Every structure is written in C-alpha cells, then in structure tokens.
Amino acid sequence: VALSIEEMTGLNYMCSCGKNHSVGIETIKVGSGVINNLPTIIKNYEGMQVFIIEDTHTYEVAGKKVEELLKEEFKVSKYIFNEEHLHPNELTLGRLLLEIPVKTDLIIAVGSGTINDISRFLGCKLGIPYVIVGTAPSMDGYASVVSPLICDGVKVTYDGVYPLAIVCDIDIMKEAPMLMLQAGLGDILGKYTALADWHVAKIINKEYFCPEVEKLVLSTLKKCEEAAAGVTSRDASTVQNITEALILSGIAIGMVGASRPASGGEHYLSHCYEMMFMNNGDNTKWLRSEEHTSEL
C-alpha cells in the first residue's frame, strides 16, 4: 500500500491475501501547525455539544489551544483529570460518565495513551464519535480499534472504534517528555518481534497472515530506524516519522482485524510489568516499550 498517511483515510479494497482491508478514519493530519485545522476538520459539528477530555499536563500543552479554537462555533464542555499518573480503570471511566453532558455530539480527546484509550471506549459505549488530538508520540494506539483498560487490577483489551479524526501537531509532539519520545520509538522497534510472532502463529497455528500489511509495517520500521538518531535532539522530521509510523501501526491492526501486525510477546511482558507496579502500590507511570529503549 504505497500511500501517504493522509491518503490512508477511507481506504477500502480487496487484498491479494483474500481479505477486504478498510480504514474507517475520515481525517489524519500530521505536521507543523495542524492543530489549527481542527475547527475545519469537525465543521459538521458546528453549533453542537463537544466534550473535551484531558489532564492537567495535556491541557497546558494543547487543551487551551483546542478550547480557544472551538469556543466561538461550538458548545464546549470539558473535564480535566488532575491525577499525576492517570490509569485507564473503572474509577476513571466512571468519572467521565458523571461529567459528560447528556446530549454530547462529539468527544475530543487531548492526550496520548490513557486519554485516547478511555475516550475511545467511552465513545464506543455511548455511540458518540471521537477525535484525538495527540500530544506525544509515545504509543501506537492513536488509530487502533481496541482499548486496553485496567479492570479489577488486570489489563484487559476491550472493543472500541476508529477515531473520526487524528490530529498530531508536530510542534506539540516534539516537545513531549523525552521518555515518551523514546517509548514511541521503542514501540515501533517492538514490531520486529511482533511480526516474528505473527509468522510463528501462521506456521504453528495456521493463523491468517497478510504479506502486504507486513510490508507496510516494515516500511515504517525502516524509516524510523534511519531517523532514530534525531530523537534526542527532538528533530521535527524524526518525530513526524515516528508519529506516522505509530499511526500506521494502529491502522494495520484495523486492516487485518487483529493485533498481530503490531503486538506480540513484548506486549504481554509490558502489560505484566504495568500490572505488577500498579498492584504493588507503585503509581509510577509505566510506558509501554521502555524495555525497548533501554539501550538508546
């Protein structure tokens, strides 16, 4: 699939693997200053109720700007989580159910991993479309169709929906904490083991496999490898390459209807570490793929 990230939206075709691949995202914008396009991207919701989900960190780096852009043409309400380390658990989702206006027409998530996951799940359960305004290139869930949540202290993956739009302003993304930049690169490098596991599953379990999707994921891996040295200097083109690779990784999951192209044994380890820390009372925010960046 030789398409740019923005051209992947609305993709729908029969692949040589025998499966119909589709991408149910209307708009993807990645680049400098693209946050300013938000009112145009959601213009069909002008005059309607928009609910913004953010935390104290993401409010400062992007949430204020989102409100400023939307306050004239949209009915805006919001909820700002003030937890230092927000977890995607029952308490967090329950709070959103208390705060979201009854007649909300659109959810706008401002953040990255946790904010995106809880917003996707909330939108799916309530039948409300959502848009994600990314703030860090830290994980591959922006374009995913599932939400990993913590239920009864255990990491469980629930069905979700594609976002209506993904907006990742590189001017914002490149200023994320360095650990989050490294985690995003680590998440991409982890696709090598994920793809290897997919091959093993094909051979041993006779699982479905798509060479074209594998090729798509590998092409993004190569771009990120070549640009990896620019992470420490927050090079804009490097951050854009990582961001686009993370989004494409999520798209690959949706295209095949399974997490195989992007998630293998390394994700099981990551989930175990996260649950161990949380259940031991350690509130330290665990970033998936930190194990992949330990040598950077």
Where in this protein do the model-derived segments appear?
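ATP/NTP phosphate-donor binding region
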Residues: V1-L106
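Active-site segments that bind and position negatively charged phosphate/pyrophosphate groups
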Residues: E214-S294
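A short, small-residue-rich loop immediately preceding and capping a beta-strand
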Residues: I100-L122, L126-A136
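Short beta-strand/turn micro-motifs composed of small residues
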Residues: I53-E54, G111, C168
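A glycine/threonine-rich phosphate-anchoring loop and its flanking beta-alpha core
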Residues: K125-K223
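Active-site histidine-anchored catalytic micro-motif
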Residues: V110, M139-A143, P148, Y273, ...
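Short helix/loop capping segments that flank catalytic or ligand/cofactor-binding pockets
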Residues: L38, V61, G141, E175-A176, ...
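Solvent-exposed alpha-helices and their adjacent loops that cap or buttress functional pockets
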Residues: N20-S22, Y45, E99-V102, G123, ...
